[in-house]
Amino acid sequence: MATWYHQKCGLKPLAPVIPRPRTGAALSSTSRVEFLDTNKVVAGPKFQPLRCNLRERNWGLKVSAPLRVASIEEEQKSVDLTNGTNGVEHEKLPEFDPGAPPPFNLADIRAAIPKHCWVKDPWRSMSYVVRDVIAVFGLAAAAAYLNNWLVWPLYWAAQGTMFWALFVLGHDCGHGSFSNNSKLNSVVGHLLHSSILVPYHGWRISHRTHHQHHGHAENDESWHPLPEKLFRSLDTVTRMLRFTAPFPLLAFPVYLFSRSPGKTGSHFDPSSDLFVPNERKDVITSTACWAAMLGLLVGLGFVMGPIQLLKLYGVPYVIFVMWLDLVTYLHHHGHEDKLPWYRGKEWSYLRGGLTTLDRDYGWINNIHHDIGTHVIHHLFPQIPHYHLVEATEAAKPVFGKYYREPKKSAAPLPFHLIGEIIRSFKTDHFVSDTGDVVYYQTDSKINGSSKLE
């Protein structure tokens, strides 16, 4: 059929062209690919349409032929330089600098958050307290009743996590996000924090300092970076306790009594430089409540025996401390990209808060009241914990690249965070003594680190 058609049209079929293979042996340098000059009119019978009264036309095919066949390497290079559709070259976009001032302000973030996210419901807050207290006493009663060594490890993990949940609710009382009633916040906060041996007002005030100076290389209160000069002056034991797991995860009780390296004072001492004179009565009250709880535990030790007290309260307390240190550390450390710390005029409340990290804890997110949703909490600590997730989703378009999506937990438990905190202990050691925007550097002598960064 094709032969008949070409004869009627006065055309000769094109000579077959064998394409250059993309795999296998390439053509030799002497191989030639010839193309038919299709612009030349071929003599022969004219094409006469049967049903249309059209004038005679030149039916030569006007096809431009390539001068040569590009090599595979050249074609690949061409693909790399173009976007594959319209030949526009890719422009190399500037890398995102997390230390650059953001193109938005706090008012922009606040405006993006729905109004109901700012509403505090004391009844809802109290419902979480009731839930957690019932869980704590229920777990203790079940463990004491069963008194089985197969059960005790499960109890310790669960009860330590519930102690941590109680701490988070007391933490909300300290921020005033529990309710608008300051007296209710103080009473509930004292009951919750004293029960797990935390001085409510002493810790509340130092934690307020942490929020007011978050991301500041010198004035931050919680897990602040060590300047190089101070780092070099630490003795070997102190360095090991600070940077070798699991010791940093047991630091909280020590911090309550002596704060961090380079800082002085105690959360129990009303004359500590942590506090101003008009806060001393609050500190005395909290210290008295803490001492009363300690006395109660000593009395229970005489009643039930020290071993039983250790199993019911002591080990869960240690698990709680590890939760607290793990979470508070990872909210400001351990990201795969280096994040800045600021000094001087480069620091601002917004820029410091944007160095905070959200973390995903799997199904424990609900148990410890979404404390992992931490960026919005740091910028606006008055938002109740039960609105943090919604507020964060609303603010993400404003944050842009300044918000870092947390890695999701592939398992019900956040085991993926263990590797991140260990990696941070091995690399995040000190910052430069000078400069207003600084990043963590690594001492190769610690934890087998291979280099000084």
UniProtKB/Swiss-Prot annotation:
<comment type="pathway">
    <text>Lipid metabolism; polyunsaturated fatty acid biosynthesis.</text>
</comment>
<protein>
    <recommendedName>
        <fullName>Omega-3 fatty acid desaturase, chloroplastic</fullName>
        <ecNumber>1.14.19.-</ecNumber>
    </recommendedName>
</protein>
<dbReference type="GO" id="GO:0006636">
    <property type="term" value="P:unsaturated fatty acid biosynthetic process"/>
</dbReference>
<dbReference type="Pfam" id="PF11960">
    <property type="entry name" value="DUF3474"/>
</dbReference>
<keyword id="KW-0443">Lipid metabolism</keyword>
<keyword id="KW-0276">Fatty acid metabolism</keyword>
<keyword id="KW-0444">Lipid biosynthesis</keyword>
<keyword id="KW-0934">Plastid</keyword>
<dbReference type="InterPro" id="IPR021863">
    <property type="entry name" value="FAS_N"/>
</dbReference>
<keyword id="KW-0150">Chloroplast</keyword>
<dbReference type="InterPro" id="IPR012171">
    <property type="entry name" value="Fatty_acid_desaturase"/>
</dbReference>
<dbReference type="InterPro" id="IPR005804">
    <property type="entry name" value="FA_desaturase_dom"/>
</dbReference>
<keyword id="KW-0275">Fatty acid biosynthesis</keyword>
<keyword id="KW-0472">Membrane</keyword>
<comment type="function">
    <text>Chloroplast omega-3 fatty acid desaturase introduces the third double bond in the biosynthesis of 16:3 and 18:3 fatty acids, important constituents of plant membranes. It is thought to use ferredoxin as an electron donor and to act on fatty acids esterified to galactolipids, sulfolipids and phosphatidylglycerol.</text>
</comment>
<dbReference type="GO" id="GO:0031969">
    <property type="term" value="C:chloroplast membrane"/>
</dbReference>
<feature type="short sequence motif" description="Histidine box-1">
    <location>
        <begin position="171"/>
        <end position="175"/>
    </location>
</feature>
<keyword id="KW-0809">Transit peptide</keyword>
<dbReference type="Pfam" id="PF00487">
    <property type="entry name" value="FA_desaturase"/>
</dbReference>
<feature type="short sequence motif" description="Histidine box-3">
    <location>
        <begin position="374"/>
        <end position="378"/>
    </location>
</feature>
<dbReference type="GO" id="GO:0042389">
    <property type="term" value="F:omega-3 fatty acid desaturase activity"/>
</dbReference>
<dbReference type="GO" id="GO:0016717">
    <property type="term" value="F:oxidoreductase activity, acting on paired donors, with oxidation of a pair of donors resulting in the reduction of molecular oxygen to two molecules of water"/>
</dbReference>
<comment type="similarity">
    <text>Belongs to the fatty acid desaturase type 1 family.</text>
</comment>
<feature type="short sequence motif" description="Histidine box-2">
    <location>
        <begin position="207"/>
        <end position="211"/>
    </location>
</feature>
<keyword id="KW-0560">Oxidoreductase</keyword>
